């Protein structure tokens, strides 16, 4: 999972992720922004569920993050509909709307993001 941190002309941090993990970048850009307390909450949840059968999720404005003992899933809230609403032959998966990654990989990105932001 490759990533890049940039600053736009206003100084806002932007995250770009490799193909297949774009939604992780969108989550940072839309939900985290400068809210490092959200990252505190996510890291605490990851420690709580790691190695267990439990899971944790937090719905944001645009994206929901879901963590279990091994992986992290981030999905666009627009995917939050029942199967009855889906047209036949349609799939929930959309690279722009859903991403899965290992918990350790995700936590490495969180740590790198914190480091980048602190270098303001």
Curated annotation (Swiss-Prot):
InterPro entries given in the database record: UPF0231 (IPR008249)
Pfam family, one: UPF0231
Transmembrane annotation, as ranges: none
Family: Belongs to the UPF0231 family.
Protein name: UPF0231 protein YacL
Organism listed in the record: Salmonella paratyphi A (strain AKU_12601)
């Amino acid at each position: 999972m490759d990533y890049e941190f940039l600053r736009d002309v206003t100084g806002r941090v932007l995250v770009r992720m490799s193909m297949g993990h774009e939604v992780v970048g969108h989550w940072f850009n839309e939900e985290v922004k400068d809210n490092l307390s959200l990252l505190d909450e996510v890291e605490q949840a990851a420690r709580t569920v790691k190695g267990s059968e439990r899971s944790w999720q937090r719905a944001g404005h645009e994206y929901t993050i879901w963590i279990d003992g091994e992986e992290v899933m981030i999905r666009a809230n627009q995917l939050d509909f029942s199967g009855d609403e889906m047209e036949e032959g349609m799939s929930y998966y959309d690279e722009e709307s859903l991403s899965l990654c290992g918990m350790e990989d995700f936590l490495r990105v969180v740590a790198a993001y914190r480091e980048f932001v602190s270098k303001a």
